[in-house]
Structures are given as C-alpha cells and as structure tokens.
Amino acid sequence: MERLQRLMMNTKVGAADANKDDTKETVYISSIALLKMLKHGRAGVPMEVMGLMLGEFVDEYTVNVVDVFAMPQSGTGVSVEAVDDVFQARMMDMLKQTGRDQMVVGWYHSHPGFGCWLSSVDVNTQKSFEQLNNRAVAVVVDPIQSVKGKVVIDAFRLIDTGALINNQEPRQTTSNSGLMNKANIQALIHGLNRHYYSLNIDYHKTPAETKMLLNLHKEQWQSGLKMQDYQEKETENLEATKRMVAVAQQYSKRIEEEKELSEEELKTRYVGKQDPKKHLAKTAENTLEENTVSVLTAGVNSIAIK
C-alpha cells in the first residue's frame, strides 16, 4: 500500500513538472525586430515607449519573435490601460495584408538608462498579457546603455503565485542553458526570481540579414574621394606638429636621463609609461599618411572637375 502511494505521489509530481516552464526556454529575436525596438526606444528618450511583438510559439522551449510594431503610447510608466485595443486590431489587420500573419507573443518597452527589470506597473501589464496567453513574454530594452556590439535587453515572465505558496520551483531544469547568464543585481532588487523570472535570449539571422548587416557600415570606393575641409585639415596638422615638437623635446630629455641609468633600470624604464620614441614615430606616420591621401584626393577631384 505504501509503495502504491509513493508511485501515485511520483506521478503527481511528474505531471506537475510536465506543465511547468523550462529553464531552457529561449526567446529568439530576429534582426529586424531588434533594430526596430532599439530605434523606437532611442526615439522616445527620455520617456518610456512600448510596442507589441509578433511571432509564434514553436514548441515548449522556443519562442520566435519575427517582427514588432510600436504602440502610440509613452510615459514614465506603461499601464494596462495604455494598450490601445483598437489600434492593435487595425495594425494586425494591415499586417495580415502584407503577409505578416503571426500572432502576438508578448510586448516590449524601454527603460532608458536604468536597466532591465519590471516595475509593479509592468508586472500588472504582464498579468493582462498572460491572461490571454500564459506564455506571453515581456521584453525590456535599455537604449541608453546599449552600445555597438552590446545590447542591454532582457525577457521576463511572471512566476505563478501557486508555486510560491506551495514552496515549489517556478520552472523545471532539464539543462544548463538557463543557468549560463548571471542575474543583474538591479533586477534582483526589483523582484527578479521573486515575482518574475528571466528568459534566455538569442538572435536569429537569416543569410540575407547577415549580408545586410555586414554591409551596413561598409565603406564604398567613393569614400576615399571625399574631401576634408582645408581649414579643419590645417588645424589638425598644426596640432599634430605641436604634439610632435613636445614629444621630441621629451624624447631628447629622456635620452640625457638614460645615460645615467644602468642596464637593469633601462629594461623597466617605460613599463606602464608612454614611450616618446614610439609615440613620435606613430604620430609622424599618421600625419604623413593623412596628408598624402588628402593631396591625392584633391588632385583626383581637380581633374574630375575639369
């Protein structure tokens, strides 16, 4: 009898774990969606902005975000009432006409300059989305702290209060994928792992998107024919000459000082310091290179004008 009870208890626990989310669950964001979120967030600084994410729930481990669109609301906080249902319905109808028939998988909003976490108002907004779909995702992006090559972004979902009451883990762990990212201390202060948990984020790029992004800041052959203003160039040359004179004087002074130093002292002479000889050579080389390019460009442009 006791064995049967243990088997029944294990079955219940297994069924409960099967319905839980997994730490391996990953939100895949496309390049166009990420660029739109960053552009929208940067345009709204210093106010918060919000929008909806379109995509699909591929399986229990994958949420695919294909595109996003902005909502006509901004403010210091985003409330449930700020979600314009009429605008959302019209926007979805227009997107379907263009072949974008994905469903709403969540929402995003910006935190300009103060990190990625959910406030109490954001938690209430996320509750309204999870009432429609319990797998809805809330993405927070910081356009101020984001720099080239490093996007400050995070995805969240609320923790079931029933699991907290029963002292259960909100998610089951089947791999180490969800344990690779270190939690932000600022998010922990604002309720991370108490009221909501963080999801893994990855970026999906098609071959066409990869080629487009590589060519985004690629210089063309016309870039070498652009002329710099002569007055600016003259000012730069004068400043470079002054720097070289100062470094040359410093170098001659160092030579006099080195005559009195031993070989052991000479080995550690410039450790952690600027070597005036190398600095002088580098400055002179850069100045000559820039002036040579400027003279050649001016000659090509003068011939082209004739």
UniProtKB/Swiss-Prot annotation:
One protein family per Pfam: RPN11_C
SUPFAM superfamilies reported in the protein's UniProt record: JAB1/MPN domain (SSF102712)
Molecular function in Gene Ontology: metal ion binding; metal-dependent deubiquitinase activity
Annotated InterPro entries: JAMM/MPN+_dom, JAMM_MPN+_peptidase_M67A, MPN, RPN11_C
GO cellular component: cytosol; mitochondrion; nuclear periphery; proteasome regulatory particle, lid subcomplex; proteasome storage granule
Domain MPN: 27-162
Binding of Zn(2+), residues: 109, 111, 122
PROSITE patterns: MPN
Keywords associated with the record: Hydrolase, Metal-binding, Metalloprotease, Protease, Proteasome, Zinc
One Gene Ontology term from the biological process aspect of the record: proteasome assembly
Motif JAMM motif, residue numbers: 109-122
Recorded family membership: Belongs to the peptidase M67A family.
Known function: Acts as a regulatory subunit of the 26 proteasome which is involved in the ATP-dependent degradation of ubiquitinated proteins.
Protein's name in the database: 26S proteasome regulatory subunit RPN11
